[in-house]
UniProtKB/Swiss-Prot annotation:
Signal peptide positions (record): none
Gene3D superfamilies registered for this protein in UniProt: Ribosomal protein L17
GO molecular function, one term: structural constituent of ribosome
Name of the protein in question: Large ribosomal subunit protein bL17
Gene: rplQ
Length: 131
């Protein structure tokens, strides 16, 4: 019986899950938009949202906690220098999960995970039109 067991197993052992979500959060912070399967996207919220909440208060202790979970100095820097101030007035709900169909090989449901309020990339056609 699986009473009081929270979180998805995703057919991985605990160390593999931990490493996978550490890498996924790092990619999300770096690129602000990633594509993954829907169950992984839903589980990613449990790892990413507390880190963004942590980054709202920039202190040495919070940076060390974030580094302990991410193990990437540049990602921690972006988390505290850009994302923390961006979501200062937002009480939660930093991620948006958008379903985007099914994967070609195995029909797994896919989803985009993006940070809410991320700056829109400037299209190359717009840049050339201005010149």
């Amino acid at each position: 019986m699986r009473h009081r067991h929270s979180g998805r197993q995703l057919n991985r052992n605990s160390s593999h899950r931990k490493a996978m979500f550490r890498n996924m959060v790092s990619s999300l912070v770096e690129h602000e938009l990633i594509k993954t399967t829907l169950p992984k996207a839903k589980e990613l919220r449990r790892y990413a949202e507390p880190l963004i909440t942590l980054s709202k208060v920039d202190s040495v202790a919070n940076r060390r906690l974030a580094f302990d979970r991410l193990r990437n100095k540049s990602t921690v820097g972006k988390l505290f220098n850009e994302l923390g101030p961006r979501y200062e007035g937002r009480p939660g709900g930093y991620l948006r999960i958008l379903k985007c169909g099914f994967r070609a090989g195995d029909k797994a449901p896919m989803a985009y995970v993006e940070l809410v309020g991320r700056p829109e990339p400037v299209a190359e056609a717009d840049v050339s039109a201005e010149d």
